[in-house]
Amino acid sequence: MRKFKILPLLLLLLTMATSAVAQKKTQKTYIPWDNGKLVVSEEGRYLKHENGAPFFWLGETGWLLPERLNRDEAEYYLEQCKRRGYNVIQVQTLNNVPSMNIYGQYSMIDGYNFKNINQKGVYGYWDHMDYIIRTAAKKGQYI
């Protein structure tokens, strides 16, 4: 008799777990810029989107992200930030001048001459920074 009391409870728990997993798989990434650019409110006290939707800045500080993490580590870090609800990742573009990324590439290869900044086959400093920005954008995060 006790088995019959537990069976409906187990079926209910199984149904709830299956529903939660299915819902998580179909959940889309919220892309905040679908609401337009960020603008300062009329009274100058907060940020909002062009369409009037409020913007809540929940930031994580990954200051040395472009210099210390490779692409796999950066993707993992940004995913962890997304799971925790961070929508802004604050990084330093240049910690020093020149800065060097994890791949040993300098931010200022030839002084301030940016003509040959991205070399083929190399994760250059600015190429790596672009990768981080694109990866964050796919996760609905501002850099």
Predicted regions and their residues:
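Bacterial Sec-dependent N-terminal signal peptides
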Residues: 1-25
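Active-site-adjacent substrate/metal-binding segments within catalytic domains
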Residues: 28-143
